[in-house]
Design a protein with these regions (language model features):
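A general structural signal for well-ordered alpha-helical segments in protein cores
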Residues: 20, 51, 55, 68, ...
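FAD-binding core/adjacent interface of flavoenzyme oxidoreductases
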Residues: 1-12, 69-155, 229-231, 242-244, ...
Length: 266
């Protein structure tokens, strides 16, 4: 149906992740397709997938295809317009339009902002070197898998659940892995000190080296990452450095549009 003659309101969804698509699934169950013409804009060049299972892809237990939640056919069958690999860069509330990185402009009647979060990055030198990545999306996992095939030594910065999953996955892929954690024990937000120590001993027996009480001062290297320098003088050689120190909500787009934000969109 032509957009200009479609009597339904246009619902634009910014974000093609789990939260946004779960909302659309529920809307469709309530006959939302009769009321709304739905368009989804995603920054990643992929359909919706289960981000939680990226660690299983890294470890070799699943493929990327196996963690897809909504296939291209699902979008088509439900009459959903999908734009991937083209992040929304601005919301114009006055004229009810959005603009994407490629310059595309789309009008809306209703707007759902489901932009998720992004990895935290410590303010240290060397973050931009080749061989440094986060552990947040498919592109990050692809970088890590390539490194595992061509390089030998990995350093993971962050001793929470995500960092441990990254370390274990890279170990399963045959890399020598060291993990740097700022705190004295692992997963201190979930485990007490004795439990964190037990976990560390178990993973140490499995071949992962640990540098606790480790404040990262610099990622060294000239043309690519070569190692991690800690503030106390310890140095860890590395061909790959993975940042896994947490996430923060993607609120910039909403804030720039004049919406109330705090630690998320209010």
């Amino acid at each position: 149906m032509n957009m200009n003659t479609d009597p339904r309101e246009h619902l634009v969804v910014i974000g093609n992740g789990m939260a946004g698509m779960r909302t659309i699934e529920e809307l469709l169950k309530r006959d939302g397709a009769a009321r709304y013409r739905i368009s989804v804009f995603g920054a990643e060049p992929h359909v919706n997938y289960n981000r939680i299972l990226l660690s299983s892809v890294l470890a070799g237990d699943k493929t990327i295809d196996e963690i897809v939640i909504n296939t291209p056919e699902w979008y088509q069958q439900n009459g959903i317009g999908l734009v991937t690999g083209d992040a929304v860069t601005a919301i114009h509330r006055g004229d009810r339009t959005i603009t994407t990185a490629s310059g595309r402009v789309a009008p809306y009647h209703k707007l759902l902002i489901a932009t998720g979060s992004r990895p935290l990055a410590p303010p240290i030198p060397g973050l931009g070197l080749p061989g440094v990545c986060a552990f947040r999306d498919i592109a990050d996992v692809e970088k890590m898998l390539l490194a595992a095939r061509t390089r030998k030594r990995a350093v993971v910065i962050g001793g929470g659940l995500l960092g441990l999953e990254a370390a274990w996955g890279l170990k399963q892929r045959g890399m020598s892995v060291a993990l740097v954690h700022l705190m004295p024990t692992l997963m201190e937000r979930q485990l007490d000190a004795p439990a964190g120590q037990l976990l560390q001993r178990d993973l140490d027996r499995r071949g992962i080296a640990f540098f606790t009480n480790g404040q990262t001062e610099e990622i060294t290297g000239t043309e690519c990452a070569e190692g991690v320098q800690l503030a106390d003088g310890r140095y860890i050689p590395a061909d790959l450095v993975v940042l896994a120190i947490g996430i923060r909500p993607n609120i910039d787009l909403a804030r720039d549009a004049g919406l109330d934000v705090n630690r998320g969109i209010v």
